[in-house]
């Protein structure tokens, strides 16, 4: 299984597609196995958290739905992280180093500062189980412009909201320090813990 080269289709996606089609093939070839109506759908853009943005739930019409993914044999996941994305754009001011005292605003250094203000032990490397984290996925910049890209994850909804509030407060404090909006935060939710919905529909 491969893509046409114009889309992202990693080995985990290929394995998932293979598993699903193999299961369908098995049911078709073994009509003696009793089962209800089975519907299959494939969604794009999983890696950017937009896989079901245009999925027509009403048209699909089913009582129960499962996402099939790679994992241990027999494993069923019934909960997941609450997920958000934080994109921070920083605009600096480049001045000749020889005359930059109290004038230059180094966007790259501000980006480093923002990242340093986040909890040191709340990264994917330092957490496990139900512990949430901030994950810096991209960092680039120079004196005039810098960019930070984070994913924020937490199982608990209240802790999730606190994490978003905290990164917002960091950006606000940096802007207050410089007396202008040197850093602009674009913060948005991507998806939520499905356990809350399952608990509402027991």
Question: Can you say where each PLM-predicted feature lies in the sequence?
Answer:
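A short glycine-threonine-serine/GTX helix/turn-capping micro-motif
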Residues: 7, 95-102
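Acidic/histidine-rich catalytic neighborhood of metal-dependent amide-processing enzymes
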Residues: 2-79, 131-133, 137, 148-155
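His/Glu-based metal-binding/catalytic segments typifying zinc-dependent metallopeptidases
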Residues: 78-79, 83-84, 88, 97
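Short, solvent-exposed loop/turn segments at secondary-structure boundaries
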Residues: 78-79, 100-102, 196-198
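Metal-dependent amide/peptide-bond hydrolase catalytic core
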Residues: 107-202
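Beta-strand secondary-structure signal
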Residues: 39-41, 85-89, 147-149, 184
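Short, solvent-exposed amphipathic alpha-helical segments in soluble enzyme
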Residues: 56-59, 82-83, 105-106, 165-169
